[in-house]
Amino acid sequence: DDVLRKNLNNVQLKNQLPPSPVLDSHDFTVEMETGTGKTYVYLRTMFELNKRYGMSKFIIVVPSVAIKEGVYKTLQITEEHFKSLYAGVPYEYYLYDSAKPADVRNFATSSVMQIMVMTVGAINKKDVNKLYQSSEKTTVDDLDKPIDLIRATRPIIIVDEPQSVDGGLNGAGKTAL
């Protein structure tokens, strides 16, 4: 927590903001106007977190299927760019699909950087969601539900357009991840 707070204070000071004396949570907000490159900024941030701190599990949560597809398209378009900026950093990205539980298993067990894009509905609809159902295809050790595998990786969660995601990732969705 001290390292995180010091980094936060450095960013605050560089931007003429008063430094926070304590770190109240591990949740950070970056606000940018529409069309200013927010998707690129958070993708680049993921690569920097991987480079500097070895963080390798990232989940991008979006409010709709259309935005999910847009983020995926951006990942495709920027793939060569990020490979040239971060030479030698292998990574995989994919859309969460409840019909493909092997993707969740790969996310949890792979040693390369993982980027999963999912809608908030995939997290919040607990009653009908395969994310919360046991599956032999996702079992690792004593974890048999996809959500448990994801949670065990302690991923970095990026919420795209949190104002459009029913109350952000409050309640069940935030707790789940």
Residue ranges and their predicted role:
Residues D1-L177:
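RecA-like P-loop NTPase motor core of helicase/translocase proteins
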